[in-house]
Amino acid sequence: MSNKSRGCNYERQLVDLLHQRGFAAVRVAGSGAKPLPTPDIVACRKGKILAIECKTSRKNQVYLRDEQVDELKVYSRTAGARPLLAIKFLQQQWHFLKPSRLPRTNGSTMVVSREFISKRGMKISDLDPLVD
């Protein structure tokens, strides 16, 4: 299975988890290939919208380009959504971060480690206060 199809499967899994928590959620097909800012998942509950960019890794860190985070922020401002990053490491549950909580690094790439997300990331149940 390719990395792309594996990532799509994880996104579908997250959509299912969000549905189980009462969200109306959809995966935006081809989100990374479009010329316009588009998140991987859009989830809504009680009139509140979450724009979610997903990252998965088998390693101990994920890399995010500044432009990916900037595009998530642009989409979120336009849609009136709350931007979130959803990060999943192999053998761990999904964790969520607001872009403002991302660790800064030199250059145009941010690195989020398995340890950082375990300590600072939100669990799926922590999304409830964002939309209730």
Regions found by a protein language model. Give the residues of each.
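Domain-level recognition of nuclease-like catalytic cores that cleave nucleotide substrates
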Residues: 5-9, 77, 82-132
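Amphipathic alpha-helical interface surfaces
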Residues: 14, 37, 68-72
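Conserved catalytic cores of phosphodiester-cleaving nucleases, focusing on short active-site segments
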Residues: 18, 41-58
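Alpha-helix C-cap/termination motif
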Residues: 21, 44, 75-79
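Active-site metal-binding core of divalent-cation-utilizing nuclease and nuclease-like domains
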Residues: 24-46
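Short, charged, amphipathic alpha-helix that recurs within catalytic cores of restriction-modification
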Residues: 49, 57-88
